[in-house]
Amino acid sequence: MTAYGHMPGEAIECLSIAVELHKQEVIDAHGQVTIRVGFKIGGGIDQDPTKAPFKYPDSGVYITNVESGSPADVAGLRKHDKILQVNGADFTMMTHDRAVKFIKQSKVLHMLVARADLPPVSLH
């Protein structure tokens, strides 16, 4: 089974990648300290995937951009990875706004992501 095209709330068995991302504190041009993760997300159970620019096959939360050299890049995240969990929270049932707020909460993100180019899981 694949994580892509998964219906929210249904059990899923797929290969996933564990990622540990340590956020980075940077000082912006105005002297303000900001916390940097280096990725953007799209999707969520409240979003219509047919209207998204990348046409993802379901309403999951996806990485839509990874900045080169950022904490996300160093941790190994890739554009189009599907976020399954962050710090134990199920992202397959999360709205977009809640996902953004959840990602902002912790300095370290322990993530499980699915990647489209991984081989399928054999149940035998």
Curated annotation (Swiss-Prot):
S-S bonds: none
Known role: May regulate a number of protein-protein interactions by competing for PDZ domain binding sites.
Domain PDZ: 18-106
Native organism: Caenorhabditis elegans
Pfam families xrefs: PDZ (PF00595)
InterPro entries: PDZ (IPR001478), PDZ_sf (IPR036034), Synaptic_Scaffolding_LAP-MAGUK (IPR050614), Tax1-binding_p3 (IPR017268)
Matches recorded under Gene3D superfamilies: 2.30.42.10
Protein name: Tax1-binding protein 3 homolog
Taxonomic superkingdom: Eukaryota
